[in-house]
């Protein structure tokens, strides 16, 4: 065992006296800033004890680690969980929660580095998990329906827009120094399954709220099994057994065997980005988020990454969230892009990695 993910890490301690909650709905019950059972200071002593146990099983060459799943706000609070004698890392849900907006993304990236650097902890990045709407759907939702968790029916967003933004968001995330966490199926560009029949649902959230004045569809839509073979969609992968949640027909086109070897596929994009991330040493680099400088760059997210082999700001990560194409600077060359065929101009909803012209990067 290499380590442990601590579920609901912010919920181990209750307020003294176990006070009643006057009004409790599903919304307020999960609010980390106001409930007497979330993010209490006493939780940290528990993790200090656990850390000592983990360290007793660790060596310099083989560390046992602990990762916190803690939904806390504001972002400064998460740094308390990754102090040197507590967790090694914590999921960055502030990043996951951020809408598709350049200013908001610049702020959360800068703040993430600020709070984690203050406690000498690695910054982490995550876009999807088993509790939230898959980002290939979430990032294309209309503003009035934009949400992390699926409470009720939403309008099916444009899948092309959603996948384009998801690929751009992933390319941005995998260019950032720190640790990146991937959720199964995102490498295939899977959308949230929004139309699971009621009699096929499994999430207790659905059954607990069904028939109430605030019904919730729950998390089943992001938990549908991934499609390995296009010919075996609607089975558990053996061609015979029904999956525990039904797979939609669109999953056939997104199956692993359909995407493998297709250089334009989302699966091959993930593989190429992860390979280049390792080769460039981006995870171990340092980042700087420059000021936009002009109104023309207001819809651009730019991050300068310094690595051992590529010097000060040697790799520039640029995401274009605006309405117009963004010209690649004359002294830079595209070494990775969330869309195929990008060379001199970055399209809308696209992210590129740029090296200095003449750099030996393949």
Residue ranges and their predicted role:
Residues 1-332, 337-362:
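Active-site and adjacent substrate-binding regions of carbohydrate-active enzymes
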